[in-house]
Amino acid sequence: MTTTAPHVPVLIDEVIAGLEPATGETHVDGTFGAGGYTRALLQAGARVYAFDRDPDAIAEGRALEDGQDGRLILVPERFSRMAEALNERGIDQVDGVTLDIGVSSMQLDRADRGFSFQADGPLDMRMEKSGMSAADFVNTADEAEIADVLHDLGEEPRARRVARAIVQARPITRTSELAEVVRRALGHKPHEKKDPATRTFQAIRIHLNAELDELEQGLAAAERVLRPGGRLAVVSFHSIEDRIVKRFLRDRSGATPAGSRHLPDARAGGPRPSFEAVAKPVRAGEAELARNPRSRSATLRVARRTAAAPWGTAPKKEGRQG
């Protein structure tokens, strides 16, 4: 385990301002991680259902339960299952949902989890510690599949060159080995701010953990569990993720100019808007960047749930709240 500075939640003040949590409300933190957003919600007096697919995050979060008078409920599930998991606990509607997309600081900071190219560790990258590891993928996938993953999920412009270098360097079992293979393939000048391995590690991680599918399903789940007037706050770090969030909120708010055969037009009898924008997208200012360098690429989007039924479902009856 590496020694790191204390975890600082990204755009925490802006997230809490967007959610407006209050005493007695029920909120979902869909990505508990090191618990930064959950702590802020608890301090505001809310009850929090904190989800995380990573068993390490849940285990370490147990200490935070003490002294909360039952207001913190840790849920060892993917956030895409929030509707089902809440229903199993007698909750149909909540006042707010927070999602901080991607790898957590806790996962990045631990070399033994294999997420970071900045520290040597086993090439793993699995959030749930099950299924295919990053080492399995880079050592068994063919060159074309690796190139497709790097291009589609990492937006790596020289994906084929990197994929070829990975195949030629097999076997690769350590994060430092993979990072060096990519750097040699692309060239790396010490003064460059962005490490050439960034896109490759991002792409493989997203692929192994099916993160984009999880995000799409999680947004739809948030739509189902939020009460009318409830708020959704999503922090994303990559353009691919932000496009998914932007498209979801644009479509659900009725901001799409016109319908198509894929997306019905609300003005022509399609579903009524289920969200409305609260504010423009928020990005980190100078003070935030100085305090928390990880916020450099972060984008926060906040929306308010309307009284319309979730898209693709019958109108929702009055539900139970925690």
From Swiss-Prot:
| Keyword match Transferase | yes
Q: Where in the cell is it found?
A: Cytoplasm
GO molecular function per UniProt: rRNA (cytosine-N4-)-methyltransferase activity
Q: What catalytic activity does the UniProt entry give for this protein?
A: cytidine(1402) in 16S rRNA + S-adenosyl-L-methionine = N(4)-methylcytidine(1402) in 16S rRNA + S-adenosyl-L-homocysteine + H(+)
Q: For bias kind Low complexity, which ranges apply? A: 295-309
Annotated binding of S-adenosyl-L-methionine, by residue: G35, G36, Y37, D52, F79, D100, Q107
Pfam families listed in its UniProt record: Methyltransf_5
Keywords from UniProt, A to Z, are: Cytoplasm, Methyltransferase, rRNA processing, S-adenosyl-L-methionine, Transferase
One Gene Ontology term, aspect cellular component: cytoplasm
For region Disordered, the annotated ranges are: 254-322
Broad class of where this protein is predominantly found: cytoplasm
Family of this protein: Belongs to the methyltransferase superfamily. RsmH family.
Q: Which NCBIfam families match?
A: 16S rRNA (cytosine(1402)-N(4))-methyltransferase RsmH (TIGR00006)
Write the protein's name: Ribosomal RNA small subunit methyltransferase H
Q: Which organism is it from?
A: Rhizorhabdus wittichii (strain DSM 6014 / CCUG 31198 / JCM 15750 / NBRC 105917 / EY 4224 / RW1)
Lineage, uppermost ranks: Bacteria, Pseudomonadati, Pseudomonadota, Alphaproteobacteria, Sphingomonadales
